[in-house]
Amino acid sequence: MKTSHSGYPHLGKSATSALLAALNGLSAASWPESDLLGPSTFNIGTLEGGEKHNIVAPSAKALCEVRMVADLPGIKAKVADIISRHPDIELNWVFEYPEALLEWEIDGFEAAPVAFGTDVPRLRDEFCGRRVLYGPGSILVAHGPDEFIRVPELIDSIAGYKKLVLHFLS
């Protein structure tokens, strides 16, 4: 990209404009859905670019996330295809892992698909062949300024953890 004074944008090439065009393409894309896990989601998590308001931006970057419920290779190909339409944009894969199908039919627990990441897929099968996600609180308040867990939920989770231990030891 090429910097210039913002009063003469035709003398430069804006990295932020190029990146926004690519991000708009990704935002407008449709992503796979699963009858079991629900829809995949796309999020532009961070966006950085430019030096000052009166300079055509010489650089920009974004960190995005697709939480996929199926077909990791297909999603990667789709992202690469969309980005390939924007020759000034470079694609770097930072982190990836496939959808996680866990043990979900356990007596005494309600099961539901969730749209958030977990380290569970990284647990090695030989050490942890049966895996679940369980814990108090709500993902709907996670990562926000008012994140919290209600005390009764925390106390009730003790019994839940005990049930899980007994389930996995049986």
Segments from the language model and where they lie:
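Metal-dependent amide/peptide-bond hydrolase catalytic core
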Residues: 1-170
